[in-house]
Regions:
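A glycine-rich (often HGG/GG-containing) alpha/beta subdomain
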Residues: 1-148, 152, 156
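Long, non-coiled-coil amphipathic alpha-helical linker/lever segments
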Residues: 126-209
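Residue-level detector of conserved catalytic or cofactor/ligand-binding positions
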Residues: 208-217
Length: 217
């Protein structure tokens, strides 16, 4: 069960790579990271400016070094989730990633549920529902066509296209209603029939795009 308002953590990259990125998001994200991350030099991590990137070490409760990492700080609302957020880039060992997650949980984090970072981004207005769905589509894309569609959707292109199509339909509907009001005057024609045909064609194109993306859901 997702607990909105808590501070969550999870590995945000696929396993098996040279680098793993652990994302922490929530009201205590910066403070929790500060408890286990010691910058190599300079001020404490929690006092650094937004978007700052810091090199240092992850230290456990006994003072032992777990890994040398690079950590990035994002302050709300300018982050992926719209919350305070940090990202720890560590070596790609599953053991190291799990050790860091365990330390974060000891420091007050909860493990994120699948899709929870994107859910928070949606709830905080960082993306609309279409864009949130596109994140899953992008991850699952298996062809160039589905990848292009997901990227366009994630950038808001699909949402804008649907919104524009809705506006055109509403405008045409109002003109057709106006024609009904003046039905006694057969010579009056407000709605452009060719525009109606074009809208129908555009709707078919949108439906075909949705059909392409369905297998990735």
């Amino acid at each position: 069960m997702m607990n909105i308002g808590s501070t969550i953590c999870a590995v945000a990259t696929a396993q098996g790579g040279a680098i793993s990125v652990i994302r922490i998001s929530g009201p205590q994200a910066i403070q929790v990271t500060d408890r286990i991350f010691k910058p190599a030099k300079g001020m404490p991590f929690s006092e650094r400016a937004p978007y700052s990137v810091s090199y240092g070490r992850i230290i456990d409760s006994e003072g032992s070094v777990v890994d040398e990492v690079v950590t990035t700080l994002y302050r709300a609302p300018k982050s992926y989730t719209g919350e305070d957020c940090t990202e720890i880039a560590c070596h790609g060992s599953t053991y190291i990633a799990n050790r860091i997650l365990a330390l974060l949980i000891e420091a007050g984090c909860s493990m994120a549920q699948p899709g929870e970072f994107t859910q928070r981004a949606f709830l905080n207005g960082k993306m609309d529902l279409s864009q949130a769905e596109a994140v899953a589509d992008l991850i699952a894309s298996t062809s160039a066509a589905t990848h292009r569609l997901a990227m366009n959707q994630m950038r808001g292109g699909f949402s804008r296209e649907l919104s524009a199509l809705r506006d055109r339909l509403l405008h045409l509907t109002s003109l057709m209603e106006l024609e009904l009001d003046f039905s006694d005057h057969e010579e009056l024609e407000f709605a452009d029939r060719s525009e109606l045909q074009q809208i129908a064609t555009d709707i078919e194109q949108v439906l075909s795009l949705i059909h392409i993306s369905e297998p990735t859901r």
